[in-house]
Amino acid sequence: MALAISDDHKELAAVAAAHLMRQNARTVARDTLDAAANTSALWASTAELGWLGLHVPEEFGGSGFGLPELTVVLEALGHELAPVPFLPTVTAAAVLAHAAPDELRSAFLPGLTDGSLIGAVGIAPGLRLDSSGVLTGESRAVLGAPDARVLVLVAGDDVVVLDSDLAGVTVTAHRGLDTTRSIGTVAASDAAVPANRVLRGAADVAVALYRILTAAEAAGSASACLETALEYVKTREQFGRPVGTFQAVKHHLANMLIGIELAVAATWDAARSADLDRVGFAAAVAAANATRAQVETARLNIQLHGGIGFTWEHDAHLYLRRADTVAALLSDGRQPLVDVVAAHRAGQAHGASLQLPPEAAEFREQARAAVQHLATLPESERRDYLVDSGYLVPHWRKPWGREAGAIEQLVIEEEFQGVEVPELGIAGWVTLTLSQVGSEEQKMRWIDPVLRGKNSWCQLFSEPGAGSDAAAVRTSATRVDGGWRVNGQKVWTSAALGCQWGLATVRTDPGAPKHAGVTMMAIDLTSPNVEIRPLREITGDELFNEVFFDDVFVPDSDVVGAVGEGWKVARATLGNERISIGGGSGSIPFTGTGLVKLLDSAVDGHPGAEREVGEILAEEHTIRLLNMRQAVRAIIGAGPGPEANVTKLVKAEHSQRITNLGMTLAGTAAVTGLEPDVTYPYLFSRCLTIAGGTSEIMRNTISERILGLPRDPLVR
């Protein structure tokens, strides 16, 4: 299960999955298609495990944990489509535990916790409560209503807690698209609601809890679709090979994983919130991400299974039915994406903070002292102080950095907010590699001048016609006395004109296999017979360059690593590059805030634009959450997850999506020079899905290295 990071949560997820497998939950779910399935055994066994009360205080019969533990179990239930009223019951209990007085909590929470009471939750508008406590109207599509004894329903800004047999209240059951769900309409005709059954001002909290817990279940269903499709394409053969080797199939599966990771990160963040009264934005982001992922993975699961996925006997359509039902329930009356925009306008666009362990205090004291000392220095001395103290590159090994672990890095990031720290860019990726694989003499000669800003490096990997294939090296070197003669051409070299050195892949053994026979060399770009020609980009800038080598001499002392093992060095450099980009560099200045301003100032109407802006804002927030989950994994030693690979790809495409929409909202102002803050980032963002590995190649990497799909046998 994807939500769990800590060992305790992983163990809980494993127990939940094993229980549902033993109870044949998915088989019971299928039985609901043709007849009323017997779900009582599954419900009873689930209640016996105490999961219904994971989030309920101990004094009311619960375990006293919280939403993080509950969402782990809900993810497992969604994975197996468990046809029990777990979601509405725990949501009702969550609302009561947070917003109800002790009298109501004592009356209902013990029964909701042990499973003797079933709860229902309705968030759709339609119920009206007058000042005398008379309830009229209807709440349609109330989850769990036909089976429930306690109804928790939104009525305006309030929540009413009703017995299902209250005079004036009727429940009409519906046989819906998702037969594993019990859904009904609750109608009230002059129903008298006692004052102690009205939770004043609790509607927003009820909606937020409903969204968070439903998102967790949706993430589980989406993961099941990915797993099923992945297993199928690995074994299903067409045209003499597994269909999972085809790039189009790989990209579908990579997109499924990306959507799930966004949903998981957003749900994880919302569930961790300590202040449920301020969780509305995070809950809306979770709901938006999770429903989109659930619907898209369910649809793609059928597509990837081909004809078999369209059959009644296959489970794929059960997940499609669930996905579309969840999407409808979560958008009934209150669109999560619209709420995302509203929260952003109100300055409430925030999620849970990252809680660091006690040992962070010492690092914080040191970093704070460094910042204070830095402020006392003349500007000309500040860079040297950052280098000497290790705060310029704290994650590097000593003597250049501080060998800072995850906790110290996060503390430094927080304490240095607003402090101007020189950005090394590509030179940082290259010199970090030199610190890892260079000789001692090379490290002494090259690294310190870069850190102190005395010279800079570029990366000489890309060649004409090679595209994203960094191993397609044709630049060659022949052995001469004392070194090598290099001939060839590199292209798309960033900032080469301003660099003194370049780290180049050079083929030294033309008879060796593609990834062998390559040697890494440091080339002095001021050497004779090196020619650098700038390439003008669509923005008008000249960042990229062509670099030509005509019998350029490279001494043996400038060979980095062993001769013939340059690909290993290149992989290290590319890895450093991707970590840096995925960690947050390479962004554009145009953000969601600018998009909201354009939306609010647009003269012409843009139907549906508010939801589109909401999607961008939700994605922008979730990118930060992917990085946060990666940081938490590092802090607790949980090992790497897929977040780093996913973040680089999502961020690049996000930059294009946000500027695309910005151009649309700006209209003619964007093309007449009146909105340069939109137009320039729009043009620049075109390169972000190309540089550092194209989005298409990144999807191949995700599908092969993370999902385990086989490589295309035709690729050499």
Residue ranges and their predicted role:
Residues 2, 13, 72, 91, ...:
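Glycine-rich phosphate/cofactor-binding loops in nucleotide/flavin-utilizing enzymes
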Residues 2-14, 78-79, 171-261, 356-358, ...:
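Glycine-rich beta->alpha junctions and the first turn(s) of the following alpha-helix
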Residues 84-102, 424-441, 467:
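N-terminal glycine-rich flavin-associated loop
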Residues 122, 138-170, 435, 487-533:
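A short core secondary-structure module
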Residues 226, 239-348, 677:
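Extended, hydrophobic interaction surfaces within ordered domains
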